[in-house]
């Protein structure tokens, strides 16, 4: 037993004095958690939330270009030229338009703007225009300009600024004709309209002729309008009806008008100076002195995140809209806290026993123990490769989620309810697909990231094992017990891959033989002791069995002792 104690003491002394190097990874006090396909709430050293949830709460300039608020005017009132919207007539450029959903000044005369939703959508793609006179009112002939008390201008009857309502002059209304040739080299928006009286008496009073008509023609189409007599729900003291039409003329096109009653002739139109992505936002939030690269109807979004869940109808350089409120992408390692008491007398330990809280400037690294003390150093090369891989992952997610789908829901008003419903359903379906794809993609990437970190640590471990060859004992926990003395310079060669195992091969061979010899002697003594104990135990058992047999036979009368003197 004394030999065993001596052997154990020698072995313990050898273990304490041996130089060691361990491979490990960073651990922190981070509370970050991510989800993967197989696990939820996996602790990680760091992560990034890919979904933006905050906004400015205001309208901002978009990339330095200010928006235009239409004030008390609706889009229809502004574009047709309601006299109450005169202050907006000078608008030329905007990043986007803002319309108060309850603006009081729309079409001042009862009626409607044909294909209103399509025109709104067109203006969502216009960034600037200029207002220009198309046909002078005096060029049409012997007719008068009509006005209405429904369209007040500073207390007097007036009419739309961009149209001319022709009525009889001297109880005559001859056939009038007018033509506009688009020689601007740009697209031009032209508007005209038809007045539909409440009765034939009103029609004769205004236009004299029986069955008035209007003919509008271009080189590619022609349309004839007749008056639709009848009383309609009205407002502003009027019950007749005006329907306003529009056409976007391309360079070189001409448009001609012929009428003998009921025509609202074009006076001013709009030359489209610049197309671009825009929106007509409808909300009551205020305009602020701020700049953003992404604008929604609830506020600006300034972020570099991949996704946002603020609003689907966004304008500018915007993150993709998804329904998820949070998508966390792992950017660090699986966070395994260090074991507080580990190793012999608190010695260093490898990655199997947890992470290292003291690792600086790296995710993976080395910890060593020798006569000069204990040291720790990060492996910057493997860390940088991992960082590059994660950066690539984020960029790939952005690229994969970039699509050409744009919502058109915000461009339609209440007239096009069925279009709105269809747009909503399409938007919901597309958003569901984007949201599912985004979540699945992040879960997959989290799995890959954590697996990548595990692989990187094991690759580093294998790299050290291949370098040390037979000069060390792999302890199986991420550490190697060196069979030779290794100062700090020697440790550095192991870390940077310049270690020369042949230089220490002879010393290591002798050390290995010494350790194996001590273990063999210790094992022999143990075997001898076990043999003695086994022999004694077997003898005692045999004696006990014999005595028990004798006592049983005596009690049953089968055995008799005769004592002779």
Curated annotation (Swiss-Prot):
Membrane topology, record value: Single-pass type I membrane protein
Chain ranges on the Cytoplasmic side, renumbered to this chain: 553-565
Family per similarity comment: Belongs to the influenza viruses hemagglutinin family.
HAMAP family listed in its UniProt record: INFV_HEMA
Sequence ranges on the Extracellular membrane side: 19-531
GO molecular function (one): host cell surface receptor binding
Glycosylation sites: 29, 181-182, 304, 487, 496, 500
Gene Ontology terms: biological process: clathrin-dependent endocytosis of virus by host cell; fusion of virus membrane with host endosome membrane; fusion of virus membrane with host plasma membrane; viral budding from plasma membrane; virion attachment to host cell
Protein name, entry field: Hemagglutinin
Keywords recorded for this protein, A-Z: Clathrin- and caveolin-independent endocytosis of virus by host, Clathrin-mediated endocytosis of virus by host, Disulfide bond, Fusion of virus membrane with host endosomal membrane, Fusion of virus membrane with host membrane, Glycoprotein, Hemagglutinin, Host cell membrane, Host membrane, Host-virus interaction, Lipoprotein, Membrane, Palmitate, Signal, Transmembrane, Transmembrane helix, Viral attachment to host cell, Viral envelope protein, Viral penetration into host cytoplasm, Virion, Virus endocytosis by host, Virus entry into host cell
Post-translational modification (record): Palmitoylated.
Note: Major glycoprotein, comprises over 80% of the envelope proteins present in virus particle. The extent of infection into host organism is determined by HA. Influenza viruses bud from the apical surface of polarized epithelial cells (e.g. bronchial epithelial cells) into lumen of lungs and are therefore usually pneumotropic. The reason is that HA is cleaved by tryptase clara which is restricted to lungs. However, HAs of H5 and H7 pantropic avian viruses subtypes can be cleaved by furin and subtilisin-type enzymes, allowing the virus to grow in other organs than lungs.
Complex and partners: Homotrimer of disulfide-linked HA1-HA2.
One Pfam entry name: Hemagglutinin
GO cellular component assignments: host cell plasma membrane; membrane; viral envelope; virion membrane
Family annotation (InterPro entries): Capsid_hemagglutn, Hemagglutn_HA1_a/b_dom_sf, Hemagglutn_influenz_A, Hemagglutn_influenz_A/B
Function: Binds to sialic acid-containing receptors on the cell surface, bringing about the attachment of the virus particle to the cell. This attachment induces virion internalization of about two third of the virus particles through clathrin-dependent endocytosis and about one third through a clathrin- and caveolin-independent pathway. Plays a major role in the determination of host range restriction and virulence. Class I viral fusion protein.
Keyword Lipoprotein applies: yes
Signal sequence segment: 1-18
Positions of S-palmitoyl cysteine lipidation: 554, 564
């Amino acid at each position: 037993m004394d030999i065993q104690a001596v052997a154990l003491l020698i072995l313990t002394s050898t273990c304490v004095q041996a130089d060691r190097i361990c491979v490990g990874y960073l651990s922190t006090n981070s509370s970050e958690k991510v989800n993967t396909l197989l696990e939820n709430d996996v602790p990680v050293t760091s992560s990034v939330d890919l979904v933006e949830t905050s906004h400015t709460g205001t309208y901002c300039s978009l990339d330095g270009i200010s928006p235009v608020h239409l004030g008390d005017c609706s889009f229809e009132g502004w574009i047709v030229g309601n006299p109450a919207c005169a202050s907006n007539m000078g608008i030329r450029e905007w990043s986007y338009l803002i319309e108060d959903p309850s603006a009081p000044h729309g079409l001042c005369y009862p009626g409607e703007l044909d294909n209103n939703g399509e025109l709104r959508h067109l203006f969502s793609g216009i960034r600037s225009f200029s207002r220009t006179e198309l046909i002078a009112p005096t060029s049409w002939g012997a007719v008068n300009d009509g006005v209405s008390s429904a369209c007040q201008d500073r207390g007097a009857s007036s009419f739309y600024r961009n149209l001319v309502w022709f009525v009889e002059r001297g109880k005559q209304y001859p056939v009038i004709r007018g033509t506009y040739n688009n020689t601007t080299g740009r697209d031009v928006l032209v508007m005209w309209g038809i007045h539909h009286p409440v009765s034939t008496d009103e029609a004769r009073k205004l236009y004299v002729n029986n069955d008035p008509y209007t003919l509008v023609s271009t080189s590619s189409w022609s349309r004839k309008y007749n008056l639709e007599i009848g009383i309609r729900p009205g407002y502003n003291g009027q019950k007749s009806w005006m329907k306003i039409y529009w056409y976007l003329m391309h360079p070189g096109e001409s448009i001609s008008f012929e009428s003998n009653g009921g025509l609202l002739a074009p006076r001013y139109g709009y030359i489209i100076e610049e197309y671009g992505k825009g929106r007509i936002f409808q909300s009551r939030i205020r305009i602020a002195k701020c700049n953003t690269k992404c604008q929604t109807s609830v506020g600006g979004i300034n972020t570099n995140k991949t996704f946002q869940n603020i609003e689907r109808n966004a304008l500018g350089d915007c993150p993709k809209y998804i329904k998820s409120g949070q998508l966390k992408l792992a950017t660090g390692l699986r966070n395994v806290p260090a074991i507080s008491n580990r190793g012999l007398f608190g010695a260093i330990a490898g990655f199997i026993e947890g992470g290292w809280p003291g690792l600086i400037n790296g995710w993976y690294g080395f910890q060593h123990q020798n006569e000069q003390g204990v040291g720790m150093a990060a492996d910057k090369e493997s860390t940088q490769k991992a960082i590059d891989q994660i950066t690539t992952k984020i960029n790939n997610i952005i690229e994969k989620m970039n699509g050409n789908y744009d919502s058109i829901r915000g461009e339609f008003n209440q007239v096009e309810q069925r279009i709105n419903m269809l747009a909503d359903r399409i938007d919901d379906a597309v958003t569901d697909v984007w949201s599912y794809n985004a979540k699945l993609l992040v879960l997959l990437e989290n799995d890959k990231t954590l697996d990548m970190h595990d692989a990187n640590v094991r690759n580093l471990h294998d790299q050290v094992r291949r370098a040390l060859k037979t000069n060390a004992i792999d302890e199986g926990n991420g550490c190697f017990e060196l069979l030779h003395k290794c100062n700090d310079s020697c440790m550095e060669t192991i870390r940077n891959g310049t270690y020369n195992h042949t230089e220490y091969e002879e010393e290591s061979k002798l050390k290995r033989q010494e350790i194996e010899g001590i273990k063999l002697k210790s094992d022999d003594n143990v075997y001898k002791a076990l043999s003695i104990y086994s022999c004694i135990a077997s003898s005692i058992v045999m004696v006990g069995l014999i005595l028990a047999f004798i006592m049983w036979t005596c009690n049953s009368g089968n055995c008799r002792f005769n004592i002779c003197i």
